C-alpha cells in the first residue's frame, strides 16, 4: 500500500513538472499591433543569441503572460499585444483566455483556428474551429453568414460566396495558384 502511494505521488510530481515545462515556450517575438504583424515588425526578439521564454498559463488562463529573458521577468497584459510567434514559427493571438493560431497576413481578413479538445477515441484526428476578424475587430466564428455581415459594403460578395462555397467547411479551402485562401481572394 505504501509503495502504491509513493508511486502515485511520484507520478503526480513528474506530471506537474512536465506541465510546468510545457507551459513555458520559447518565442521569436511579439507583434504589438496588427499593423506590426502585417509588416512583420516584432518586439521582444532574440538578443545575444537568447530567446525570450513566455509563460502562457494554458491550464489556468490569466489575463497576462510572463516573459523571461536573462533572469529578468516582464509581465505583459494579453490585451496590450496583437500576437506572439513561437520558435517553431506558429503565430498565436490571445483572446479571452484562449489561443488562436493566425493563418494568414491579409489586412482585410485575418483567419484563425483553435484546436478543440478531442476524445482519445478519435485519435489521430485533430479537430479545429475556425474564426476570422477584420483588422483588430473582435473574433467571429467563420461562417458564410458572418462573412456577409462583416463585408456589407461589398455588394456582390454574397452571390460570389454562395457560388464559390457549398457550406461553411469549404471556407478554409486553399488556392494553390494564388498562394492564399480562396476566401481571401474573393474579398480582395
Which role does the model predict for each range below?
Residues 1-28:
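Bacterial Sec-dependent N-terminal signal peptides
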Residues 25-164:
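Aromatic-patch recognition
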Residues 150-188:
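C-terminal partner/receptor-binding element of secreted or periplasmic proteins
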Amino acid at each position: 500500500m505504501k509503495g502504491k502511494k509513493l508511486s502515485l505521488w511520484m507520478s503526480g510530481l513528474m506530471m506537474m513538472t512536465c506541465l510546468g515545462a510545457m507551459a513555458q515556450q520559447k518565442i521569436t517575438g511579439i507583434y504589438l499591433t496588427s499593423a506590426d504583424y502585417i509588416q512583420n515588425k516584432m518586439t521582444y526578439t532574440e538578443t545575444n543569441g537568447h530567446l525570450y521564454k513566455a509563460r502562457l498559463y494554458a491550464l489556468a488562463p490569466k489575463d497576462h503572460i510572463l516573459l523571461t529573458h536573462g533572469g529578468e521577468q516582464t509581465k505583459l497584459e494579453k490585451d496590450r499585444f496583437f500576437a506572439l510567434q513561437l520558435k517553431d514559427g506558429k503565430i498565436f493571438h490571445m483572446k479571452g483566455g484562449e489561443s488562436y493560431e493566425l493563418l494568414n497576413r491579409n489586412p482585410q481578413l485575418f483567419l484563425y483556428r483553435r484546436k478543440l479538445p478531442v476524445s482519445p477515441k478519435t485519435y489521430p484526428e485533430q479537430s479545429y474551429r475556425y474564426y476570422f476578424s477584420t483588422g483588430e475587430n473582435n473574433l467571429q466564428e467563420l461562417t458564410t453568414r458572418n462573412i456577409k455581415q462583416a463585408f456589407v459594403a461589398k455588394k456582390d460578395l454574397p452571390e460570389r460566396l454562395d457560388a464559390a462555397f457549398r457550406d461553411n467547411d469549404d471556407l478554409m479551402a486553399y488556392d494553390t495558384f494564388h498562394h492564399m485562401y480562396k476566401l481571401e481572394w474573393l474579398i480582395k
